[in-house]
Design a protein with these regions (language model features):
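Beta-strand-enriched cores of mature, soluble protein domains
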Residues: 1-131
Length: 131
């Protein structure tokens, strides 16, 4: 079982759209915020979520998502992070549930779970160790 080691809160900065070679719509959203963990302490966090889907699936209830970002720790250390997983529209709510697994540049495996509130564009979540 994964151990909870931290929490984070990020706010939306900007979204851009493009098309890939398959003609899918690619959504790229940038976020910034802060987080803390029992293993690394506090950090400023910046990252990008990327998802792609055909135009005909624009109103889907779920899909794949990936995250690429960096954490800037209070001690000056910079850590890269990558993760992939899924998003799902919450039933009867204006929000998305996101669950991803990935690793950081220190080699630690992590799971991230959280909710994006689409009214105020805030992503709050928890970090779990998979080591």
């Amino acid at each position: 079982m994964a151990e909870k080691i931290g929490e984070f809160s990020m706010e939306h900065v900007v979204t851009s759209y493009s098309r890939n070679a398959n003609g899918d719509i690619v959504s790229t959203t940038d976020w910034k915020g802060s987080g803390s963990s029992t293993t690394l302490g506090g950090a400023q966090v910046f990252g990008t979520f990327i998802s792609a889907a055909p135009l005909s699936e624009s109103n889907e209830k779920s899909g794949e998502i990936e995250f690429i970002g960096e954490s800037f720790l209070e001690n000056g250390t910079q850590i890269g992070n990558v993760a992939s997983g899924a998003w799902e529209k919450a039933e009867n709510e204006h929000s998305w549930k996101i669950s991803m697994e990935g690793e950081n540049s220190l080699g630690h495996k992590r799971r991230y779970e959280g909710t994006v509130d689409l009214e105020n564009l805030i992503f709050n979540g928890e970090i779990y160790s998979l080591d």
